[in-house]
Amino acid sequence: MKIELTVNGLKIQAQYQNEEIENVHKPLLHMLAALQTVNPQRRTVVFLCAPPGTGKSTLTTFWEYLAQQDPELPAIQTLPMDGFHHYNSWLDAHQLRPFKGAPETFDVAKLTENLRQVVEGDCTWPQYDRQKHDPVEDALHVTAPLVIVEGNWLLLDDEKWLELASFCDFSIFIHAPAQILRERLISRKIAGGLTRQVAEAFYARTDGPNVERVLMNSRQANLIVEMTEEGRYHFTS
């Protein structure tokens, strides 16, 4: 299936194999829907954690689309973690802008408070503006009975991040070999206009350490999905 999706405000051309849709994505969504029916009066919160380059933002947007097409599924809403980046002014004051995207560049306390509001009822959620390169407050109105919070650090085995677990009903981790992610991330930067030399330097400084940290320091998820070199997804056996 070829489909145009709006991901973080940008139009993305995505493609998923029909076999993968039937054997991975639809069964996974029905499993999450079953979780939601256990306590339908309460919002179900799913964490999707993955290293950079695994296509998680596009994937969750595609899941939203699949849920809209299936009357047996509840409405699903994606809540990206990127809206909890510290503002550039804060990053500059702390000399952290070159490392934007690392755990230290996120406002974990703010994320924790927002997750508490998500569990309790209708609320808003910030979104990262990729033109301004800063968060926009109250950009999303959270209304769906099933939400998927996606980001790199949701399962980080670090004291500051452990409190997030109390708001999570089910967690999914997308795994892929670091070398595959390296090539995907460098290619993405080149497609954005950078030379290969600059793209490789960016990977070495920012994306590479983040990939390794997610792969090596994330806590065990309830479900692991593997991404292949071709960008396809399958359940681990």
Curated annotation (Swiss-Prot):
ATP binds at A50, P51, P52, G53, T54, G55, K56, S57. The keyword Transferase applies. Keywords: ATP-binding, Kinase, Nucleotide-binding, Transferase. PANTHER family: URIDINE KINASE. SUPFAM superfamilies: P-loop containing nucleoside triphosphate hydrolases. Disulfide bonds: none annotated. The keyword Oxidoreductase does not apply. InterPro entries: P-loop_NTPase (IPR027417). It comes from the Bacteria. This is Uncharacterized protein YggC. It comes from Escherichia coli (strain K12).
